[in-house]
């Protein structure tokens, strides 16, 4: 059977993109033909995928997305698929994977009346409505209960259309998959001295992920502690604004940016803490990757997956409304109390051993291929 996957952009280091890759690969491994429609593709593409790069010309994101949608619809009329799966919201999907927050709720919380008059707003609101409004048949694969509550608040979506997926962590991220003495070996590989503290932040879109908050927390540390602490920021974005902030706060030499690395599991083995003080995050797969790596986490309550950190007792969740002073204090405490970090790390490893943090691709593939397998 032919399963068509729709996503606007693919690059190897995005959370949505990684979930897409694992789900689509699982569907392909079950013997189905996987067709992918995308505006751009970075990195390797599995040979089993039929990759179609959709031509778009608009100078705006919402303009390109509208062109993409129209082109894909025309192509599907000529080359039908048995299932159409979206990783971005758009009309006509059989299944939607909700990697993002509710746009209507975000606008209600953050935007004023004038924003609602823009063509950008009209586009994104219409595409979300077409996915979630009552009477549609689109099956909705969700990551958190908070997402479901927000969408039902705005669209009164039928409850039976929602299905919560378990997380889907790559098995190679698990602490038990690392080589012996991985911490020492990977710290040496990255030029990190044993007495130095390594803070790690992973995720594209530095503004939304709260990289500024991490830099401010680093800068707030007592001088002797700050001098001995590094922050590695890994993700696809332009770091200039954040480099300038680090310079202004006197910690430029402590902060290192990487535009995407394929050795994140090694960095997690080498690090002392994961920082993820996000402003907005539908789920936050990196939080669970840290748990499975045995890496303590400092994060914010807005993250859909933050409750896992609390459940595992492997770090601290900063409540809303966010307090920079609280993050500063929690970071100082974590870095000066080694037994606390060790207890958090042990709790994380136990949680990784006893909870299902891994089966998202299989469960999603079951939903997508329901009625097609066999």
UniProtKB/Swiss-Prot annotation:
Keywords of this entry: Cell inner membrane, Cell membrane, Glycosyltransferase, Lipopolysaccharide biosynthesis, Membrane, Transferase
Give the PANTHER family listed for this entry: GLYCOSYLTRANSFERASE, LIPOPOLYSACCHARIDE CORE BIOSYNTHESIS PROTEIN RFAG
InterPro entries given in the database record: Glyco_trans_1, Glyco_trans_4-like_N
Gene symbol here is waaG
Cited function: Glucosyltransferase involved in the biosynthesis of the core oligosaccharide region of lipopolysaccharide (LPS). Catalyzes the addition of the first outer-core glucose from UDP-glucose to the inner-core heptose II. Cannot use other sugar donors, such as UDP-galactose, UDP-glucuronic acid, UDP-galacuronic acid, GDP-mannose, ADP-glucose and GDP-glucose. In the absence of a lipid acceptor, can slowly hydrolyze UDP-glucose.
User: Protein name, please?
Assistant: Lipopolysaccharide glucosyltransferase WaaG
**Under the cellular component aspect of Gene Ontology, which terms does the record hold?**
plasma membrane
Q: How is its activity regulated?
A: Inhibited by divalent metal ions such as Mg(2+), Mn(2+), Ca(2+), Zn(2+), Co(2+), Ni(2+) and Cu(2+).
